[in-house]
Amino acid sequence: MNREMTSSFLLLTFAICKLIIAVGLNVGPSELLRIGAIDVDGHFTVHPSDLASVSSDFGMLKSPEEPLAVLHPSSAEDVARLVRTAYGSATAFPVSARGHGHSINGQAAAGRNGVVVEMNHGVTGTPKPLVRPDEMYVDVWGGELWVDVLKKTLEHGLAPKSWTDYLYLTVGGTLSNAGISGQAFHHGPQISNVLELDVVTGKGEVMRCSEEENTRLFHGVLGGLGQFGIITRARISLEPAPQRVRWIRVLYSSFKVFTEDQEYLISMHGQLKFDYVEGFVIVDEGLVNNWRSSFFSPRNPVKISSVSSNGSVLYCLEITKNYHDSDSEIVDQEVEILMKKLNFIPTSVFTTDLQYVDFLDRVHKAELKLRSKNLWEVPHPWLNLFVPKSRISDFDKGVFKGILGNKTSGPILIYPMNKDKWDERSSAVTPDEEVFYLVALLRSALTDGEETQKLEYLKDQNRRILEFCEQAKINVKQYLPHHATQEEWVAHFGDKWDRFRSLKAEFDPRHILATGQRIFQNPSLSLFPPSSSSSSAASW
C-alpha cells in the first residue's frame, strides 16, 4: 500500500471510527474497516463535500442523510469488490448506485450505514462508449449520460432509438426504471432496446446477461429499480440518425378529440407516421412560463386567450417528423398528409424546424434558464402515473378539470403508449390494457410563491390524486414508483410480485442493493454470511 493509499485508508478509518462513536451504528467496526481495505482501481472518499453531494437528489423531498463513504469506481470489478465485501460481512451494509441524482424520493440513498457508488462517468477512468457501426449497437458504461451517448453515436451517423425527454440522466438509471419519451409508442421504452448487460449482483458477481445468457437476470434488471444488480455496461441498439426535426404543436379544447387523435397517431403501424408523439395539459396560461416553452418565441407567439375552449383546460399535441437535409420537400408533403387526418383547432398550429440533436436536448436549454433564475434546485414533488386508456376520460374530469383547480406549478405531460412495445418479462409494471397513458405532473415547489406553489400544497394534491384514482377504481400504476409499505409494493407489482421477490432472493439475498427504494427490509441481519464468494467476471 503506497503512501497515498495509506493516507486515504487512515482518513477513512478515522472517519468511520468517529461515526461509530457518534451515532452508535449497528455495523461493527471490524466490518466497516474492511471498506477502507478494499483494493480498487478507482477510489473511496469520505470528504464532507463528497458525502453531502450524494445525500440529496433532484426531488429534494427527503432530509439529506450522508453515507459512510462514496466509491468512485473505474470498472465493474471495483463495484463488485465493494458489494462482495458487503455481502460477506457479518452485518451486511447497504450499497446504492447513484447516477446523476435525478431521483425524486431518495431512491439512490444508502443511508448512514451504507456506501454510495458514484456511477456518473467522468469522475474516474471508466470505459468510454464503444460504437460498433457494422453491428448497429453501442456499449456504454452504466454511469454514462445519455447526452454523451448521443454525441458519440452521432459521430458515426447513428443514434439510439428510444429516449427520455431529458438527456442528463445515466444509462443505468433509466434502464432500472424504463426510460420513456415520445418515441416509446413506436420503439418501446429504452429497456426494449437493450441487447446485453453486465450486472454486479447483490452477491458481488459480475454477470453478463442477454436474451441468450442469464435471461432471467437480464429481464429482471430491466425496470427492476436496482433491486437485483448494478448495471455497469449496457449494449444499446442503434439506428441511422436523422439530421433535422420538424416540430409541431397544435391545440385542442376537447379532451375526447385530443385523445382520439393521439391514439390514432400511435396506431399507424407500418404506415407513414410521426416519429414522436407527446402532449400536455394547459390549465392556465403557464404554458409559456414552464421548462417546455423553449419551442415558442416572439416570432412564434402563443395566444392562449385567443383560442376558445369550453372551460379552463386546453390540450396540446406535440409531434415531430425526422428527416435529412436532402428530404426537405418530401417532409413537407408527409407532414401535410398526416396533419389532414387530425382534428385540432385550425388556428393553433405552431411549427419550428431544428437540428435533431437540438430537439433531443431541448429540456437542457430550459434547465440552464431556470438555473440562472435559481429555479432549478428547488423541491420537485413529481408524480408520474400510467393510466389505462379506458379510464383516461375519468382522470381528465377528476384531476385536470377538478383537483388541479386551474393551477399547474409545472408541466403536465399526457401521451399514450402501446403495451405490445413493452416486454412483459421485464420488471417494469404497466396497466392491463393494450393502450395506456403516461400522465406526468412535473411540478416545482417555491418557498416564496403563492400558496398553490408551496411544497406541502403540491404534496397534498398528489395524495388527493392518488386517493381519487383509488376511490374511482382507476387502476393506475406509478412510473418511477414510490410506496410507503411492502403491501403497497405488492399491489404495485401485482402478478409480477412473486417473480420479483424470487429474483431478489436469488441475486440479492441479503437485501444490500438499492435500499432507498424501500421495497424490502434493510440489509438482512439474520442470514449468516457465506464462507466464500465467487465472481464470474465479464470484461468489455
Swiss-Prot record:
Amino acids binding FAD: 97, 99, 101, 103, 107, 165, 170, 176, 180, 231, 479, 517
Keyword field contains Transport: no
An example Gene Ontology CC term for this record: extracellular region
Entry GO MF terms: cytokinin dehydrogenase activity; FAD binding
Signal peptide extent: 1-22
UniProt KW keywords: FAD, Flavoprotein, Glycoprotein, Oxidoreductase, Secreted, Signal
Broad class of the protein's primary localization: secreted
Database matches in InterPro entries: Cytok_DH_C_sf, Cytokinin_DH_FAD/cytokin-bd, FAD-bd_PCMH, FAD-bd_PCMH-like_sf, FAD-bd_PCMH_sub1, FAD-bd_PCMH_sub2, FAD-linked_Oxase-like_C, FAD-linked_Oxidoreductases_BP
EC number(s) from the headed UniProt entry: 1.5.99.12
Positions where Pros-8alpha-FAD histidine occurs in the chain: 102
Pfam families to which the protein is assigned, alphabetical: Cytokin-bind, FAD_binding_4
Cofactor: FAD
Catalytic activity reported: N(6)-dimethylallyladenine + A + H2O = 3-methyl-2-butenal + adenine + AH2
Compartmental location: Secreted, Extracellular space
GO biological process: cytokinin catabolic process
Positions annotated as glycosylated: 310, 406
SUPFAM superfamilies membership: FAD-binding/transporter-associated domain-like, FAD-linked oxidases, C-terminal domain
Free-text tissue specificity from the UniProt record: Expressed in the developing leaf petioles and in the rib zone of the axillary shoot meristems. In roots, expressed in the vascular cylinder within the root apical meristem and only faintly detectable in the differentiated root.
Function: Catalyzes the oxidation of cytokinins, a family of N(6)-substituted adenine derivatives that are plant hormones, where the substituent is an isopentenyl group. In association with CKX3 regulates the activity of the reproductive meristems, flower organ size and ovule formation.
Family affiliation: Belongs to the oxygen-dependent FAD-linked oxidoreductase family.
Name assigned to this protein: Cytokinin dehydrogenase 5
Protein source organism: Arabidopsis thaliana
